[in-house]
Amino acid sequence: MSTDFILAVDQGTTSSRAIIFDKKGNIRKIAQKEFTQIYPKSGWVEHDAMEIWGTQSGVMREALEFGRVKPDQIAAIGITNQRETVVVWDKETGDPVYNAIVWQCRRTSSICDEIKRDPQFVKYIKENTGLVVDAYFSGTKVKWILDNVEGAREKANAGKLLMGTIDTWLIWNLTRGKVHATDYSNASRTMLFNINSLEWDKKILDYLNIPESMLPEVKNSSEVFGVTDSHTLGGAEIPIAGVAGDQHAALFGHCCFEKGMAKNTYGTGCFALMNVGDKPVYSDEGLLTTIAWAENGKPTYALEGSVFIAGAVIQWIRDGLGLVRSAEDSEYYATKIDSTNGVYLVPAFVGLGTPYWDMYARGTIVGITRDTKREHIIRAALEAIAYQAKDVLECMKEDTGLDLAGLRVDGGAVQNNFLMQFQSDILQSEISKPKINEITGLGAVFLAGLAVGFWKDKQELKSILTTEKVFEPQKDSQAVAHDYRGWKKAVERSKAWAECYS
């Protein structure tokens, strides 16, 4: 039987998904299942690792069944996953010793504070992992499990425990324990991996007291990791051939293969990544340096910036203020007026991310007069999403010296044509919206397909990624500069608010 399809395993923070793609990039079937979010204490977030595996294997079988695709028609599997979330499990039984600690979890802040008392070590971590010291990343989460779960430290020292990010956990289960591996992109998000020497960093491992025997083998993002166990998917041994963290997979799915190409994902927040080529670029502007993907032992690096509140500000004007009935209504109201009339909304509801990194900033609306109507507030909320993206992309230009070679976009908010046009105006750059919505899954199958010869090269991938709409700047640069100065002034008003008035 011919292998006509590739299966994307898309394991996210709130749901497990499986997507079957054909050779033209068309989607044959999507299956999705949400799973439990566990909050043991304030600021703590966990997932049941067995539930993750159960839901993920379930949706894979469901996609095959309802897509009417036989397992032996699948040429390869590509995995993309929520990053930084980590699992520690028993090497013999395969049972987790504790729940997966999720990327959002802040329980290891005190460990990070302790590390920060040593500025030289903080500098070492940034220069060698590309990351800042933060509870966000996997390393301190592993230390917490070893220090706090009874018997874990002893078992780890005896070589009886394994650890891995979610991709590693899925690969282990798909192969029934035959393969313990990760890819370069996921490894680069652990705060344990040296992105210069491309190996686990012994100095950091020793500092956190994590035995190297726990760590997975690091492989290329496009490479055959192993095959599914014959009992996993209807008897077929399917190559697992592509692996990348979700944001990295999206960059690859957008075909951002050249230096200076960037993508922005508009979800609850925003994640912007720029391809910076075959050498790491370290940021003076609060960006993270990461490995985008690796092929044939050669990494491609990226700069990453994150915005905490993007689409969530539209949810707020809908649910919190009642200014719109649906997110779609925001475009209608924003286009009823020509401008915000000097109103700016800074959605710093949980502080500000890149490049400000102010956890005490709070949401602010400035420029209100008696003439201000709800349309002005709604438009200001949408414009804030674009301004924040510009903040991040300006930092990338500053750090790299590269001009933005257009911006590829994905996520729910890209359906808002007003927002996309304003984004193009404020960046003075072309914005490309693809026809395919499932860009993250597409990136995973692109990586897998290249590894098994399903697609011959990146040129063929580019022909699959078709553009639905291109937005060109319609506003002159002087007007843009004037509006952006106003945004910067509004941001200054929002800073340190909770510090002063809490």
From Swiss-Prot:
* EC nos: 2.7.1.30
Keywords on record:
ATP-binding, Glycerol metabolism, Kinase, Nucleotide-binding, Transferase
Reactions catalysed according to its record:
glycerol + ATP = sn-glycerol 3-phosphate + ADP + H(+)
Q: Which residues bind glycerol?
A: 83-84, 136, 246-247
The residues listed in the UniProt record as binding ADP, with positions renumbered to this chain, are: 13, 17, 268, 311, 412, 416
Where does the record locate the signal sequence feature? none
Activation and inhibition: Inhibited by fructose 1,6-bisphosphate (FBP).
Q: In what pathway does it function?
A: Polyol metabolism; glycerol degradation via glycerol kinase pathway; sn-glycerol 3-phosphate from glycerol: step 1/1
Q: Per its UniProt entry, what is the enzyme's top EC class, as one word?
A: transferase
Amino acids binding ATP: 13-15, 268, 311, 315, 412
Example of a GO cellular component annotation carried by this entry: cytosol
Q: Which domain of life is it from?
A: Bacteria
Function description: Key enzyme in the regulation of glycerol uptake and metabolism. Catalyzes the phosphorylation of glycerol to yield sn-glycerol 3-phosphate.
Q: Which family does it belong to?
A: Belongs to the FGGY kinase family.
Q: What is this protein called?
A: Glycerol kinase
Designated gene of the protein: glpK
